[in-house]
Amino acid sequence: MNHSETITIECTINGMPFQLHAVPGTPLSELLREQGLLSVKQGCCVGECGACTVLVDGTAIDSCLYLAAWAEGKEIRTLEGEAKGGKLSHVQQAYAKSGAVQCGFCTPGLIMATTAMLAKPREKPLTITEIRRGLAGNLCRCTGYQMIVNTVLDCEKTK
């Protein structure tokens, strides 16, 4: 296949319809960054760090491993889509208030993973073990994770 050939991808990103063009094999993270969605970080590019976490149909995924072509017909949410009317989401507010993260590189991925975790219906509150498991794909070099876990617990109480 000639690399100059492109595919057309129709999807919704942060509530807005998009018709995008990409070379087959392009990761979703790259395509999103080309649209100016710079919260989608390119860290490890092998699905180990979680800096590229976005929601696809409500599920947190590593967008560096997710082909752009697979986004056809999907609803994609990035950190840029979480604030509504200039107001941060309750998860964004909680992370900002708690100071759970330091340098900020991991913050978008953690917020998106937290958002997905909190959106899942359940009968009981999340346990610390469930939170740690839910954030296991998101690396943070600056913290010991306890403040992040506490932030998720606070988010659940205030949602």
From Swiss-Prot:
Metabolic or biological pathway, per its Swiss-Prot or TrEMBL entry: Purine metabolism; hypoxanthine degradation; urate from hypoxanthine: step 1/2
GO MF, any single term: oxidoreductase activity
SUPFAM superfamilies noted in UniProt: 2Fe-2S ferredoxin-like, CO dehydrogenase ISP C-domain like
GO terms of biological process kind: hypoxanthine catabolic process; purine ribonucleoside salvage
Coiled-coil segments on the chain, per record: none
Keyword Protein transport: no
Cited PROSITE patterns: 2FE2S_FER_2
Entry cofactors: [2Fe-2S] cluster
Residue ranges of domain 2Fe-2S ferredoxin-type in the record: 7-82
Binding site for [2Fe-2S] cluster: 44, 49, 52
Superkingdom: Bacteria
Cofactor: how and how many bound: Binds 2 [2Fe-2S] clusters.
UniProt keywords, alphabetically: 2Fe-2S, Iron, Iron-sulfur, Metal-binding, Purine metabolism, Purine salvage
NCBIfam families: PRK09908.1
Function: Iron-sulfur subunit of the xanthine dehydrogenase complex.
Subunit structure: Heterotrimer of XdhA, XdhB and XdhC.
Name recorded for this polypeptide: Xanthine dehydrogenase iron-sulfur-binding subunit
Gene name tied to this protein: xdhC
